[in-house]
């Protein structure tokens, strides 16, 4: 395929996108400063409960509250606004909630990655290079809403503490003037770093571009060069101009060529296009599609990588062998969830074949059953593992995001590997480095929780926690409980307050003393007609906040529990984000919650058992979590980086 493109820049194309929101940026900055002052004054005072009236409302005037706008779709990407609030819905009545600076300041996380301010979305091009983990991300330098997208850049020694570097790539060429969109990194055997990314042209056509470091001797990779003959790929015949995006990390074929896949759709069928290259400048499109699944719509942020069937270690993207399965993951534009399938990769036929066609990509398994999208993995050659990043969006109003001056966080990086016990799903678990933030711990063994009981867990504070817990149902109750053919689904179940014979039971996180606000993370067990137990793992946001301009959903799915296993979970609580992992990471749920009372020193932790027919025995260990050091990089630090 030729390097030159039929798309040329408009003669009078404007490159002033970065100045469109100067007034918004100024407004956001002033509010952020006010938030910091209010927060400092608040935490300086001892308090047992949060006083929602301690700071005057900044969002109480409904007449001045702007309407939530659709963002992203007209430009050719998935909806970036809260679709529930976009439709005009409010949870409850009475207009928007009177948020104040105390509440909004509390929402900012302490150990999840996020920029100092403004909007962030997809993780891009993560890699490990010369002693540093690099993380790039979709970023709006001009405001707390989607738009004016460039690449932010940060580096870390341990995936926990981060230094913000200058922007890696900005929208300064005709082929990316409407956005430097998502891309992936490939490290070649000679050490060269290749970055392929999607650019939105001056005519909103999606094209693929090549960039590379200006100085490979710089471990921070601060400066990047865009290939002078970009774009290297344009939409092929039969693919619409706005349906061609997000190139993957390349993998090496047995012929010595590099292969990538790019997400698209043909009518309503999601597809993964395949290209081969030897130099990342010219490409050969393969006739076969890597995969295609009818009815799944546009595929964004495709990821493709091997996992070992024997070893616990991660594998380089180019690794092949008999004892390997391949993972294909897509982000569905239609519902904004990340789906994956396990299967076999046939290099000669250029085909991924799912192990279970009924659970092919976009149909069955998901990385995460909460708010988790546009994820991307990379092979960490330092620790021989595959690491997963995911974008955690907001579920509050856009107006509240503008008021607090930022929107979105990234998940805690997760190790991804095949579940050797089931062979049919992945395991995801926070990287071990997050445990370096653990402080004081409290341990509770064999706590008996009776049906209908709520038990306070006596810990110091409950805003930044790492919780590990196990639960057991009484064996006698299991034997007596009647069999049922009723299937349980978390999102239509009625939540943690709806009682059944063997559930729900678990933990209330971010709860206040009076339980006017709480977020349950729980198990629900059903005894099937064959006598087998079917377990669901859920997270219920319906009572997480008194605010009515927040989308409060119930998330979750089934979780495999093997014979002899106790029910186990791990929860990371970090202010407004709750990441939950069941059975070693077989099922994961990420939630965004926005309490108005259960904040700062007023946040509590409870055990609960809403089962009707069984006692539950719980054992748990709870760590207070330190804050990560996430701060700007200063040039004086450069001499310390080699």
From Swiss-Prot:
Which residues of the precursor form the propeptide? 1-95
Query: Is Transport among this UniProt entry's keywords?
Result: no
Query: In Gene Ontology terms, what is a biological process of this protein?
Result: sucrose metabolic process
Residue positions of the active site: 122
Question: GO CC terms on record?
Answer: membrane; vacuolar lumen
Q: Which residues lie on this side of the membrane: Cytoplasmic?
A: 1-22
Alphabetized SMART domains for the sequence:
Glyco_32
Pathway it belongs to? Glycan biosynthesis; sucrose metabolism
Tell me which parts of the chain lie in the Lumenal compartment: 44-642
State which residues carry a glycan (glycosylated): 100, 267, 491, 615
Lineage: superkingdom = Eukaryota
Report keywords, A-Z.
Disulfide bond, Glycoprotein, Glycosidase, Hydrolase, Membrane, Signal-anchor, Transmembrane, Transmembrane helix, Vacuole, Zymogen
Question: InterPro entries from the xrefs?
Answer: Beta-fructofuranosidase_N, ConA-like_dom_sf, Fructan_Metab_Enzymes, Glyco_hydro_32, Glyco_hydro_32_AS, Glyco_hydro_32_C, Glyco_hydro_32_N, Glyco_hydro_beta-prop_sf
Write out the annotated subcellular location: Membrane; Vacuole; Vacuole lumen
Question: Which EC number(s) does UniProt give?
Answer: 3.2.1.26
Regions annotated as coiled coil? none
Q: Which residues cross the membrane?
A: 23-43
Show the GO MF annotations.
Answer: beta-fructofuranosidase activity
Which proteins does it associate with, and in what oligomeric form? Answer: May be present in two forms, a 70 kDa monomer and a heterodimer of the 30 kDa and 38 kDa subunits. The ratio of the levels of the two forms within cells appears to be regulated developmentally.
Q: Tell me the PANTHER family matching this sequence.
A: BETA-FRUCTOFURANOSIDASE, INSOLUBLE ISOENZYME CWINV1-RELATED
Q: What is this protein called?
A: Acid beta-fructofuranosidase
Q: Which organism is it from?
A: Vicia faba
List the taxonomic lineage: Eukaryota, Viridiplantae, Streptophyta, Embryophyta, Tracheophyta
Query: Which gene does this sequence derive from?
Result: VCINV
